[in-house]
Amino acid sequence: MKKYLALALIAPLLISCSTTKKGGTYNEAWVKDTNGFDILMGQFAHNIENIWGFKEVVIAGPKDYVKYTDQYQTRSHINFDDGTITIETIAGTEPAAHLRRAIIKTLLMGDDPSSVDLYSDVDDITISKEPFLYGQVVDNTGQPIRWEGRASNFADYLLKNRLKSRSNGLRIIYSVTINMVPNHLDKRAHKYLGMVRQASRKYGVDESLILAIMQTESSFNPYAVSRSDALGLMQVVQHTAGKDVFRSQGKSGTPSRSFLFDPASNIDTGTAYLAMLNNVYLGGIDNPTSRRYAVITAYNGGAGSVLRVFSNDKIQAANIINTMTPGDVYQTLTTRHPSAESRRYLYKVNTAQKSYRRR
């Protein structure tokens, strides 16, 4: 078990040096750090597999909160896309007690991602007077869960009525699954509307676009992380988009992890980057709808890759786009962009933005 603890201690140091696809300039140190982070995550996944068994690896992601405790024998998994909370344990003694404790802490955890290490088994989850999941989950009587007494009673109900077990050949896994309320996505989005409106006014970016990016990137999960270390609600990367924004604001260095895990700071930085894409990197595109399609795609795959779809010369690329209808630009980006992820990304964000415009 010592090697798992050592990995957990090393993880935060390596994670802070990583980055992802969003941003502009090539950075050799970033490439090395990204490779190191990939190696670390591979080791972390391998260690979880050793403990839990084959095909039982679950790791935190942009839309998945996963926290291990009890020497990695118990885990809480919130799937923000599916709207499910699954608490599991492989503890050989008193598994119900391990599940009960994890259920209560998960239901009552706060919304400060910087205080929780998702890459260790340290029990650093604090019970909050304003639980992050309040209103997104109701108990067996249909009531939202704010206090420890109600959470404890619900945990007892779940263990009595919904406890399941399965064997993977190596371990017996005990689990309880909780369904979130049907409109859990809207409940989370509502938490951040004030911050979105403030950033929208500050940078001149449409609220509906900010919300659509947040939904697509993280499903409004403030704990969002990625294998390439994009952080927070808008999946901002310290050493690429974060650095670009800081430079444009006259700041040196890069935003810290704690800065990007703060929802207001994350939304401000992500929106500032959208404004940079719109006004600077892709400002040569005249039609606002065509430029919006380019900005959305660039937020995922970079402005350079967007322009290269049309021409290797940036100025010529903008000129070509300016001769096309917005529909043709959309069609081109969703069919000819070299990245399948970026092609899907434009479709997802554009669809989500339409729904927010109707509200």
Swiss-Prot record:
Q: Which InterPro entries match?
A: Lysozyme-like_dom_sf, Murein_transglycosylaseC, Murein_transglycosylaseC_N, Transglyc_AS, Transglycosylase_SLT_dom_1
How does the UniProt record describe the way this protein sits in the membrane?
Answer: Lipid-anchor
Subcellular location, in the record's words? Answer: Cell outer membrane
UniProt keyword annotations, A-Z? Cell outer membrane, Cell wall biogenesis/degradation, Lipoprotein, Lyase, Membrane, Palmitate, Signal
One Gene Ontology cellular component term attached to this UniProt record is: cell outer membrane
Please identify the protein, giving its name as recorded.
Membrane-bound lytic murein transglycosylase C
Q: Where is the signal peptide?
A: 1-16
Q: Where is the lipid attached (S-diacylglycerol cysteine)?
A: 17
EC category name: lyase
Under the heading HAMAP family, the entry gives: MltC
> Do you know which PANTHER family this protein is assigned to?
MEMBRANE-BOUND LYTIC MUREIN TRANSGLYCOSYLASE C, SOLUBLE LYTIC MUREIN TRANSGLYCOSYLASE-RELATED
Lipidated residue numbers (N-palmitoyl cysteine): 17
The protein's superkingdom reads Bacteria
A single Gene Ontology biological process assigned to it is: peptidoglycan metabolic process
Q: What's its job? A: Murein-degrading enzyme. May play a role in recycling of muropeptides during cell elongation and/or cell division.
Query: Pfam families of this UniProt entry?
Result: Mltc_N, SLT
Report the sequence similarity comment from the record: Belongs to the transglycosylase Slt family.
Catalyzed reactions: Exolytic cleavage of the (1->4)-beta-glycosidic linkage between N-acetylmuramic acid (MurNAc) and N-acetylglucosamine (GlcNAc) residues in peptidoglycan, from either the reducing or the non-reducing ends of the peptidoglycan chains, with concomitant formation of a 1,6-anhydrobond in the MurNAc residue
| Annotated S-S bridges | none
Q: Which organism is it from?
A: Escherichia coli O157:H7
Enumerate the GO terms in the molecular function aspect: hydrolase activity, acting on glycosyl bonds; peptidoglycan lytic transglycosylase activity
EC number(s) from the headed UniProt entry:
4.2.2.n1
